[in-house]
A protein has these predicted regions:
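PLP-dependent aminotransferase class I/II
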Residues: 37-41, 49-50, 125-129, 134, ...
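Amphipathic, non-transmembrane alpha-helical secondary structure
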Residues: 19, 63, 112-120, 139, ...
């Protein structure tokens, strides 16, 4: 048997990406410029949205969405307890109060009945999270928001454009996902995407903010606000300032520095060309995994349903009957067999930062149950079918072995 060493999620970079980056390096313009603008345009085409703003991370995108909406002190923003910290930390960055909701049984989505109960007169935004690229139930989300419309009081220009709680999707994993045929980005009111090195589509670091078409939104004005907030509050970006005689500018708010560079965008332009084939290969791998685990104690999340076609960013599984300790032993045994794996994620109330904010894991039992026996397997386009088969057989064997030993002891 071959000696395997299977990484969790390496980037898929070809000579085409390298050539495009080299072209940018030779061009004399490497920060935000024409290639960033071109990537924004093409991403808007891909997601069927009016505008896209490329930034240096999805976290920056999520925070800037809240800042454009002028969410701040005295406001509440609702997030699921089962997510990565970035979904929630941005709420504290703007001075608002995070409100966590437990998830449904056997899935990562918020319990929509609990969500409805969590809404108050202070609720300004709900942040659903598309874990692994699996899109949430937006029909239900918008029903909840409409039902609670009378509680909402707008306190800013863009809040008035909605006149209800705004749904801001954390779609870090979901570029290429669809809900009832609609692409992620065009479903929620606002959406943030991640282009981090481990994502399906990468610019090394990076992310974007976008919004769905809305007659109450002036898209050019909205885009300009994002641009200003992403570059110190400056009224001109670097490319505009460098035009002959165009040095004059103003700072209209003491803002941030989170713009994307043309070096990063160069990667993205080629990745977007390749993206259909990258998604197809991920689908083939997930289908192979699903067939291999059918009838076993390994239960993966479903990436395709009647309403959802996932981007298949993560292959999240649960090991039936495994305790937290057994789950951790299985991960160690997989590592010994040359298979990298991961856990997505520690629920937020388990983390020190959120304990210090007063959150208690005991209040979110289903989030803990989801975490307790969860293992994420390698899912990337460099995996061979042979490696996938090895992972399947090893994972099943190791899981049975660990659970059998636990019963004996």
């Amino acid at each position: 048997m071959p000696n395997y060493n299977i990484p969790f999620s390496p980037p898929d970079i070809t000579e085409a990406e390298i050539a495009e980056v080299a072209d940018t390096l030779r061009s004399g313009w490497i920060t935000t410029g024409p290639k960033t603008k071109e990537l924004e345009r093409r991403l808007s085409q891909y997601t069927q949205t009016p505008k896209t703003v490329c930034l240096n991370s999805a976290t920056a995108a999520l925070e800037l969405i809240l800042r454009v909406l002028e969410v701040g002190p005295g406001d509440e923003v609702i997030v699921p307890a089962m997510t990565y910290t970035a979904s929630c930390s941005v709420i504290t960055h703007v001075g608002a109060t995070p409100v966590m909701v437990d998830i449904q049984a056997d899935t990562f989505e918020m319990d929509y009945d609990l969500l409805e109960q969590a809404i108050t007169e202070k609720t300004k935004v709900i942040i659903p999270v598309e874990l692994a690229g699996i899109v949430c139930d937006y029909d239900r989300l918008f029903q909840v928001v409409e039902k609670k419309r009378d509680l909402f009081t707008a306190s800013s220009k863009w809040q008035k454009a909605f006149n209800r709680i705004v749904i801001v999707s954390d779609s870090a994993h979901a570029l290429g996902s669809t809900y009832k045929g609609q692409p992620a980005g065009s479903i929620a009111d606002f959406t943030s995407f991640s282009f981090h090195a481990v994502k399906n589509f990468t610019t090394a670091e990076g992310g974007s903010a976008t919004w769905k078409a809305n007659p109450a939104i002036d898209d050019e004005e909205m885009y300009k606000e994002f641009q200003i907030l992403s570059l110190h509050g400056q009224t001109k970006d670097a490319l505009a300032k460098m035009q002959l005689g165009s040095w004059e500018y103003d700072i209209v708010t003491p803002a941030y520095k989170c713009n994307m560079t043309d070096i990063m965008a160069s990667l993205g332009l080629v990745q977007l060309d390749r993206y259909p084939s990258l998604l197809q290969r991920r689908k083939e791998i997930v289908d192979r995994y699903d067939r291999g685990f059918a009838g076993s104690r390994i239960h993966p999340l479903a990436h395709k349903t009647e309403t959802v076609e996932s981007s298949r960013h993560l292959y999240i599984t649960h090991v039936e009957g495994a305790s937290l300790e057994e789950r951790n032993l299985i991960i160690q045994e997989l590592a010994k067999a040359g298979i990298a794996s991961n856990v997505h994620y520690k629920p937020l109330p388990l983390l020190t930062a959120y304990k210090n904010l007063g959150f208690d894991m005991a209040d979110y039992p289903r989030a803990y149950a989801f975490f307790e026996n969860e293992i994420t397997l390698p899912l990337h386009t460099k995996l061979s079918d042979e490696e996938v088969d090895y992972i399947i057989e090893t994972f099943k064997t190791v899981s049975e072995k660990v659970l059998a030993l636990s019963k004996k002891s």
